[in-house]
Amino acid sequence: MAPSLSTAVSSLLLLLLLAAAISVSSSPPMPEDSIRVISAEKRIDLTSPIVKVFLTLKLENDATAPEASQVLLAFTPTEVEHLAIVKATRAEGKRKKKIYVPLSVKASDLAAAPNGARLYSILLSTPLKPAEVTTLEVFYALTHSLEPFPAEITQSDPQLVYYRDSAVLLSPYHVLEQVTYIKMPSNRVESFTRVDPTSRAGNEVKYGAYNNQLPNSYVPILVHYENNRPFAVVEEFVRKVEISHWGNVQITEQYKLKHGGAQHKGVFSRLEYQSRPSISGVSSFKNLLARLPPRVHSVYYRDEIGNISSSHLRSDSHKSELEIEPRYPLFGGWHCTFTIGYGLPLQDFLFESDDGRRYINLTFGCPLLDTVVDDLTIKVVLPEGSTSPQAVVPFLMEQYLETSYSYLDVVGRTTVVLKKRNVVGEHNVPFQVYYEFNPIFMLAEPLMLISAVFLFFVACIAYLHMDLSIGKS
């Protein structure tokens, strides 16, 4: 009895293993099995405090694989933490007729790659057919990825930073050939990791070419170099946009700014700073450039003390540039707060859609150039009586509504609040806020003002005709 039972169990296990093998063999190939990277070129720009990476991928789908509707990108956990934006385009056409079609990029729902790497999906406009070859251009920006070393410097020291990455492309696909270029702001490169073949020409280090890299390959490298660009970090940025249908858009921007580079140690000598500008405080910054909308008016720049006169405005019909100077130069770890305000002509920014709704068209992001915004808030205050507000922004963010009150308001003004963290210059794109508005509400405040004046005169007349004298009883 026992031998027959053992034989039955063995036969059952054999059938289960055979079924599992058939299931695995008939299942569609995984993405890393069906797509391969023919060539990859990675260019890393370290000339500013923001790390900018340009990636060119030439991909081929396997001849026996089904159509691929997406391409996966892999990022390390550290890169995901500091990732500000990812954009991708696909090259279509040949030579002079070649165009680059923007593609949607989002975090993938697939399981993470080895070592905690996170996958992002590039959604292709048209599926990649079997044996088809295509080229993708990818751009992404990393903030707070440069580590000052030494962490503290004196007024006369240059600023040195570390940058960590991989000599080979981290990818879920098999990479046949690849090369990486790292560009620094100057020729002063203290050291860099060598992974043969590695070469250096001036301010650029080249890694590769490397051939036949397996999926999820990673070779850590470290670059130590001089970067004296101002590490301007806006810890908190709040923009308030107030719309008046009487002809004006008033904008108020509040900044909490800090120098995010190597911490300043020792005393500060203004005499040395002014007499030796090429040596003293080379990594500090004493002015900033803000790119404002065209045709701005009534511009002011002030801090908690009062107006700051050290600013210069250049404005025309195409752009406006405001150069501002804080009351003191900013060194590593130093902070300052200030406010910029200006007005805009209503007819240039408020429009009416085909369905009768009104919408304001503005630029998202921070107007200060080459800055990182840790926490950004935009408040669009709609005219009193506005209903059905809707914000259209080309990327994910937090949105909610609140009510604001101003002079002569009765029910308050609907305010659309937009919040986003880790904002860079590539986020400075147009966005719209749609709303419905009954023109009768434009008469509310004038009627209240007229009524108040009328009641005041009635009270004055009544007072003049009142007999307040004390008569004899």
Curated annotation (Swiss-Prot):
GO biological process: protein N-linked glycosylation via asparagine
Subunit structure: Component of the oligosaccharyltransferase (OST) complex.
Lumenal-facing ranges: 28-439
Major localization listed first in the record, in broad terms: endoplasmic reticulum
Swiss-Prot/TrEMBL keywords: Endoplasmic reticulum, Glycoprotein, Membrane, Signal, Transmembrane, Transmembrane helix
Gene for this chain: OST1B
Pathway listed: Protein modification; protein glycosylation
Protein name: Dolichyl-diphosphooligosaccharide--protein glycosyltransferase subunit 1B
Residues in the Cytoplasmic compartment per record: 461-473
